[in-house]
Amino acid sequence: MTTSGALFPSLVPGSRGSSSKYLVEFRAGKMSLKGSTVTPDKRKGLVYIQQTDDSLIHFCWKDRTSGNVEDDLIIFPDDCEFKRVPQCTTGRVYVLKFKAGSKRLFFWMQEPKTDKDEEHCRKVNEYLNNPPMPGALGGNASGGHELSALGGEGGLQSLLGNMSHNQLMQLIGPTGLGGLGGLGALTGPGLASLLGSGGFPTSSSSSSSRSQSAAVTPSSTTSSTHVTPAPAVPAAASVTSPSPVPSSGSGTSSATSPTQPIQLSDLQNILATMNVPSGAGGQQVDLATVLTPEIMAPILANAEVQERLMPYLPSGESLPQTAEEIQNTLTSPQFQQALSMFSAALASGQHGPLMSQFGLPAEAIDAANKGDVEAFAKAMQNSVKSDQKEGDSKDKKDEEEDMSLD
């Protein structure tokens, strides 16, 4: 089946196909920070940003010689900023600075020409803080940005005029923009007037706008630097979008043939009758309002909890794995935002099969299928209590055996 991404590249200026699997990539080496001085690692490296199948954005650095990926960080919108270090005058040094805590990762450009430096920096910030719409365009790196250009009524009518009813249903279906909040990319005066006063199923589309709303906020870097980097061999970087693929199938409406232009009223009627997932109609629970920093503080003070959470912290140089870092991470605005996004995704009722892959109890999977966040949390809590009872029972049995031996 043709993906909805094939409907757009020919309509949006500048879109093109490519085989690159990364949103943005460029050659750069790592640097180590000691005191107020950064020292370059002379290995040939590659910085790249990738969106995986779970829609998460990864900022990565790998050794180009060995192919080993040494840094793989999951980044949420407004989590960090990538900027040049102006204090360094002997090389082209950039820093990935996290807004929560003191994490900083330094890199030095290995591209021989400087003309793309500013563009690479801009694209890194763009994709980290305004990632492509999850699942909407089959992995198209620039889909969300292209669709935003169609927000005007004229753009929408031009788009619809080139689509058959079959393509339109495909566009707003589960694999197109009808996914969780997918139509948010078309927001604008044109869509507002199109939808009128109630055509949009708000309960099924309220969650994903958070992932598109973050903006880059400049911050300062005060460390002094002494670097003498050496440029390496150039390599081309590209941002990709899919090439048009012809769609097949007959039209689904008897009133309008596939060759007849589609009007805005047609789309309005379809949107008004779209089915909302069963879990989205009930009362939704936002985990971010439950797991507040005040509630988490005494839990995070538990040494056993800290030990269990430590392996899940980001790893890499200049990224300490400490109890303080756990506190900073779980109480950060970015983590709260991630909780809200997870709550909305879970409430959609479409993630039961995904949860089953993690070996969760049947009660939790059933709650995920129903989109019941509260029941999901209770099922997980009951599972932990059951595991604790089994562990306590085993410990008690071992103690009794030891006593009998004495």
UniProtKB/Swiss-Prot annotation:
Compositional bias per record (Basic and acidic residues), positions renumbered to this chain: 386-397
One annotated GO biological process: proteasome assembly
GO CC field: cytoplasm; nucleus; proteasome complex; proteasome regulatory particle, lid subcomplex
Annotated compartments: Cytoplasm; Nucleus
Domain Pru, residue spans: 18-131
Domain called DEUBAD: residue spans: 277-390
GO molecular function (one): endopeptidase activator activity
UniProt biased composition (Low complexity): 198-259
Disordered: annotated segments: 198-260, 379-406
Keywords: Cytoplasm, Nucleus, Proteasome
Broad class of the protein's primary localization: cytoplasm
Source taxon at top rank: Eukaryota
Family designation: Belongs to the ADRM1 family.
Described purpose of this protein according to its UniProt entry: Component of the 26S proteasome, a multiprotein complex involved in the ATP-dependent degradation of ubiquitinated proteins. This complex plays a key role in the maintenance of protein homeostasis by removing misfolded or damaged proteins, which could impair cellular functions, and by removing proteins whose functions are no longer required. Therefore, the proteasome participates in numerous cellular processes, including cell cycle progression, apoptosis, or DNA damage repair. Within the complex, functions as a proteasomal ubiquitin receptor.
PANTHER family recorded: ADHESION REGULATING MOLECULE 1 110 KDA CELL MEMBRANE GLYCOPROTEIN, PROTEASOMAL UBIQUITIN RECEPTOR ADRM1
Record's subunit section: Component of the 19S proteasome regulatory particle complex. The 26S proteasome consists of a 20S core particle (CP) and two 19S regulatory subunits (RP).
Name of this chain's protein: Proteasomal ubiquitin receptor ADRM1
Organism: Gallus gallus (Chicken)
Organism lineage string: Eukaryota, Metazoa, Chordata, Craniata, Vertebrata
Gene that this polypeptide is encoded by: ADRM1
